[in-house]
């Protein structure tokens, strides 16, 4: 399938997707009932969309194109109310978090969807193992070349995005010792990690054409890069975050990415080069393993910096951009989070260390999502 032309969109507009967990009380294992919920709510959603993801235990909430995080928050809040009522009607519950702490991948049912069934045929059990839950953020771009510049700029801050959203310390009933274990699930996919280097949109079109020769790629949606351009929407899509436990944190993460994009495309602070990616996977690993306590290394100078310190520096740099696009509240909230040292992964571990069970942990996450 040929790649569509890049559809120009209004710069810095926003779209957010949240992959939510559908769980079955009182055992709080993953349910296989997302289709039931989608059928129940499809005529009640007036803005945004509630839809399938890979398996029947995943429920995706997606906003329409939004001008700012306040509009996105309003759409999510309305969807959340409808979904929670439908879940209660069917004796189900909903929660965030990047992984379910004790589900077994062998039990997961792939959705009856042509694309997902084709993906199952290509990737086998890897697709069932990909029953993990992330937040994706789209940012509008005026051109394909702007999208490539923005993608490279945002890639510098992938460790920061992972660390701030880390919410997946448990998997398959085990403490993984990672703050964010979710990204590890995709390491076996041939397109895992950063997009191969291109310097402009024309080179990207050549790259996509080459990838299509493998017969495994029908569209951009079949590529699992950490950040990818989406020509159909005219956006760049950041895909590295765990789904947060609260709607407010999800909105704050979107505000961070929107403000960072505004700063990058307005100030053009970097002259991107392929060497920028030399230590990409090492820095990404530090964020996944240690969260904000990780240490990142500059591929050009060899300087090593604590992620906490570098994240505070980023928040300071983008504050003027955040003010211009209505995202200051997000930057202020994330600044408080970094200074306090609190993060969702550690809060989960604290709950278990205090005697809580993994079943109790999922129940608590459902209460948090419903109570906000």
From Swiss-Prot:
One of its GO terms (molecular function) is glutamate-cysteine ligase activity. It catalyses: L-cysteine + L-glutamate + ATP = gamma-L-glutamyl-L-cysteine + ADP + phosphate + H(+). Keywords: ATP-binding, Ligase, Nucleotide-binding. Gene3D superfamilies: 3.30.590.20. InterPro entries: GCL_type2/YbdK_subfam, GCS2, Gln_synth/guanido_kin_cat_dom, YbdK. Its EC number is 6.3.2.2. Belongs to the glutamate--cysteine ligase type 2 family. YbdK subfamily. Homodimer. NCBIfam families: gshA_cyan_rel, PRK13516.1. HAMAP family: Glu_cys_ligase_2. This is Putative glutamate--cysteine ligase 2. It comes from Escherichia fergusonii (strain ATCC 35469 / DSM 13698 / CCUG 18766 / IAM 14443 / JCM 21226 / LMG 7866 / NBRC 102419 / NCTC 12128 / CDC 0568-73).
């Amino acid at each position: 399938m040929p790649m569509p032309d890049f559809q120009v969109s209004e710069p810095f507009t926003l779209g957010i997707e949240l992959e939510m967990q559908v769980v079955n009380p009182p055992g709080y294992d993953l349910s296989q009932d997302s289709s039931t919920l989608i059928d129940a709510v499809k005529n009640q959603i007036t803005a945004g969309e509630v839809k399938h993801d890979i398996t029947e235990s995943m429920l995706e909430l997606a906003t329409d194109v939004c001008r700012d995080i306040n509009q996105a928050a309003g759409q999510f809040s309305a969807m959340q109310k409808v979904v929670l009522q439908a879940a209660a009607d069917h004796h189900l519950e909903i929660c965030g978090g990047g992984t379910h702490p004790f589900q077994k991948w062998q039990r997961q049912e792939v959705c009856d969807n042509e694309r997902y069934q084709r993906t199952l045929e290509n990737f086998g059990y890897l697709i069932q193992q990909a029953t993990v839950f992330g937040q994706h953020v789209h940012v509008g771009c005026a051109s394909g070349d702007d999208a490539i510049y923005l993608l490279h700029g945002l890639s510098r801050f992938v460790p920061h995005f992972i660390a701030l959203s880390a919410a997946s310390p448990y998997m398959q009933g085990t403490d993984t010792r990672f703050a964010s274990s979710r990204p590890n699930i995709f390491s076996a996919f041939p397109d895992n990690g950063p997009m191969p280097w291109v310097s402009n949109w024309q080179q990207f079109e050549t790259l996509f054409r080459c990838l299509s020769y493998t017969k495994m790629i029908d569209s951009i949606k079949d590529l699992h890069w950490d950040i990818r351009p989406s020509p159909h929407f005219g956006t760049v899509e950041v895909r590295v975050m765990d789904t947060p436990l609260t709607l407010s944190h999800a909105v704050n993460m979107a505000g961070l990415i929107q403000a960072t994009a505004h700063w990058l495309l307005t100030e053009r602070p970097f002259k991107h080069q392929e060497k920028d990616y030399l230590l990409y996977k090492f820095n990404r690993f530090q964020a996944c393993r240690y969260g904000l306590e990780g240490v990142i290394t500059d591929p050009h100078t060899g300087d090593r910096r604590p992620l906490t310190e570098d994240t505070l520096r980023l928040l300071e740099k983008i504050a003027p951009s955040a003010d211009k696009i209505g995202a200051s509240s997000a930057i202020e909230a994330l600044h408080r989070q970094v200074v306090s040292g609190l993060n969702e992964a550690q809060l989960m571990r604290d709950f278990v260390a205090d005697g809580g069970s993994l079943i109790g942990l999922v129940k608590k996450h459902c209460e948090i999502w419903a109570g906000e």
